Amino acid sequence: TKSFVSPELAKALRKVDKGDVVLTNTSEDYEGVCRALVYLGDRQAVTGGHATVFKPNSCVLGKYFAYFTQTEVFHQQKRKHTKGTKVLDVSATDMAKLSIPIPCPSDPKKSLQIQARIVSILDKFDALTTSLTEGLPREIELRQKQYEYYRDLLLSFPKPEEVGV
């Protein structure tokens, strides 16, 4: 969904560029807090007050970080900084305290290559999972129709007047 804000309002909001990771600061449920998405749009976007923008840098790829936010290690860290009862929140200041494990921290070039490989593998798993999730119900529906067709064919005996004796 696209929506636009006035240029004046956009100046006051945080900018989101292609490859940035946007995290929710606030949610009514624990799973929604710090949920991440990688912005893939070509045009600059903006976000409001209940989101934090992670800008990838020379040490961490955006998609690597987004995948990391789905891990138990991240959730354990997030738990320590989540505040609230009805509405849960992790402030941008607290998010900055979360540590991101990166491979080969002493060799940034190698680290980024490994991160890219990890992202590639996880993207493939995600595509396969999505394919199965979307394709399986359709396949089940087709098999059900096939079953019904053959069942009806096998159980459609000739009517008594058609039977030659």
Summary of predicted features, one role per range:
Residues 1-165:
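Charged, alpha-helix-forming regions
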